[in-house]
A protein has these predicted regions:
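Conserved catalytic-core motifs of eukaryotic protein kinase domains, centered on the activation segment
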Residues: 116-117, 122-124, 148, 182-183
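Conserved hydrophobic/aromatic beta-strand scaffold that supports enzyme active sites
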Residues: 161-163, 171, 179
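Flexible glycine-rich beta->alpha loop in the catalytic core of nucleotide-sugar glycosyltransferases
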Residues: 110, 117-118, 149, 160-161, ...
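Beta-rich strand-turn-strand
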Residues: 93-95, 141-155, 160-164
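Domain-scale signature associated with acetyltransferase and cell-envelope carbohydrate enzymes
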Residues: 1-113, 133-135, 152, 168, ...
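Glycine-rich NAD(P)-binding loop of Rossmann-like domains
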Residues: 122-135
């Protein structure tokens, strides 16, 4: 098809791509204007609610937003690493501190909070930092509650309610979430929001992970 295009048609297509890139860059700058630090090549689709003077996003940060996507650092610190993807309807609210590593993907309608907001009769208010390690994939409508530390390369199943720490290379599911499988990555690592497997910086070969059933 490209060979059938005239030089003028190719030029017009190139100009359209450049304009689209500029629009995306301006959109990201406007949507993320309140963050304290913004990385390179950020993309924001839709109109997310982004509020927080103590929020940092790394390079290649992507938000696929509807009107419900909310990122709030409030009185706390909210940190996103490089190549983080946030899907429609996800809500992340930091009152104390939430840290998200590199290559992390949030599916739609995920809810992450580091505070109960208020206590109830017989149970005091709880507030504790949340940490999500590199290479994690958080499934649709999963909830991550205050005080949870999720290790590296963890897959959180759809609808899971994570109430306690999760070790590296685990698949967790259920309410409350528990480890149902251990995942082994013998040679390569996965960038969660990509469809393909990509090699670790020090490894040339790539293999898919071996799934090991737990007793």
């Amino acid at each position: 098809v490209d060979e059938q295009l005239t030089p003028w048609q190719r030029k017009r297509i190139e100009l359209r791509w450049r304009r689209a890139f500029v629009r995306q860059e301006l959109k990201a700058r406007w949507s993320l204007r309140k963050v304290s630090k913004r990385g390179k090549r950020c993309i924001v689709l839709g109109s997310p609610v982004v509020d927080g003077s103590d929020m940092e996003v790394g390079d290649d940060f992507k938000v696929w937003s509807g009107h419900r996507t909310t990122l709030i650092s409030g009185w706390g610190r909210l940190r996103f690493g490089d190549r983080v993807f946030v899907n429609v309807g996800t809500t992340i609210i930091a009152v104390e501190q939430i840290v998200v590593g590199d290559d992390v993907a949030f599916a739609n309608d995920v809810f992450v909070m580091d505070s109960d907001s208020h206590g109830v009769e017989g149970r005091p208010h709880r507030q504790a930092p949340v940490s999500i390690g590199d290479g994690c994939w958080i499934g649709a409508r999963a909830m991550i509650l205050p005080g949870v530390t999720i290790g590296k390369r963890v897959l959180v199943a759809a609808g899971a309610v994570v109430t306690k720490d999760v070790p590296d290379d685990s698949l967790v599911a259920g309410n409350p979430a528990r480890v149902v499988r251990q995942l082994s990555y013998p040679v390569g690592c996965r960038r969660a929001w990509h469809d393909e497997w990509c090699p670790c910086p020090k490894v040339a070969a790539v293999q898919e992970p071996v799934v090991e059933e737990t007793a």
